[in-house]
Amino acid sequence: MLLSDKDIRAEIDNGRVRIDPFDDSMVQPSSIDVRLDRYFRVFENHRYPHIDPSVEQVDLTRLVEPEGDEPFILHPGEFVLASTYEVVSLPDDLASRLEGKSSLGRLGLVTHSTAGFIDPGFSGHVTLELSNLATLPIKLWPGMKIGQLCLFRLTSPAEHPYGSERYGSRYQGQRGPTASRSFLNFHRTQV
């Protein structure tokens, strides 16, 4: 069940959902807007001949911070990691989906490639997978609205929520845009 603005506020007011910093003006009819932090992780395309999710490639990305109040310029066809300004913490019976903002999508900005789902129990900055599908560069201003979180109530609390020992939870408590850690639990079935 998708939570309404009334339910979102109630979950925040009683401390079950934490959005930090919280700004009530970000609450929408069935979502809460999130803003862009000031850190970006750019890909170093010359370091490796290819990306291999089965091995650690420590120099694959580099952390970048725009100077002062300057925007980050995302060029056509470019892909970077960024993160929400807000720290998001969910209880064991709520999951979330990160969706893009319609106005930014109409400019060619993709907010996430595939990883828009946030498990119950997660706590941390949400990593964004930003792509520019437009034919012109896009200015990304730290602090701008970048997406919206929709909250869903589970039919029952997760038996092993994100952050529990069972799943490893490689991104629990992440700060800023976090590079892939797929190598930590890479799985391949012989076919």
UniProtKB/Swiss-Prot annotation:
Question: Binding of dCTP: at which residues?
Answer: K101, S102, S103, L104, G105, R106, D119, T127, L128, E129, Q148, Y162, Q174
- Keywords noted in UniProt: Hydrolase, Nucleotide metabolism, Nucleotide-binding
Q: Where is this site: Important for bifunctional activity?
A: G116, F117
**Keyword Transmembrane helix appears in the UniProt entry:** no
**Listed GO molecular functions?**
dCTP deaminase (dUMP-forming) activity; dCTP deaminase activity; nucleotide binding
Q: Which catalysed reactions does the entry list for this protein?
A: dCTP + 2 H2O = dUMP + NH4(+) + diphosphate
Give GO BP annotations, semicolon-separated.
dUMP biosynthetic process; dUTP biosynthetic process; nucleobase-containing small molecule interconversion
InterPro entries attached here?
Answer: dCTP_deaminase, dUTPase-like_sf, dUTPase_trimeric
Pathway(s) it belongs to: Pyrimidine metabolism; dUMP biosynthesis; dUMP from dCTP: step 1/1
Q: Name one Pfam family in it.
A: DCD
Q: Catalytic site residues?
A: E129
- Enzyme Commission number: 3.5.4.30
> Which of the seven top EC classes does this enzyme belong to?
hydrolase
- Subunit info? Homotrimer.
Give the similarity note. Belongs to the dCTP deaminase family.
Q: What does this protein do?
A: Bifunctional enzyme that catalyzes both the deamination of dCTP to dUTP and the hydrolysis of dUTP to dUMP without releasing the toxic dUTP intermediate.
State what protein this is by name: dCTP deaminase, dUMP-forming
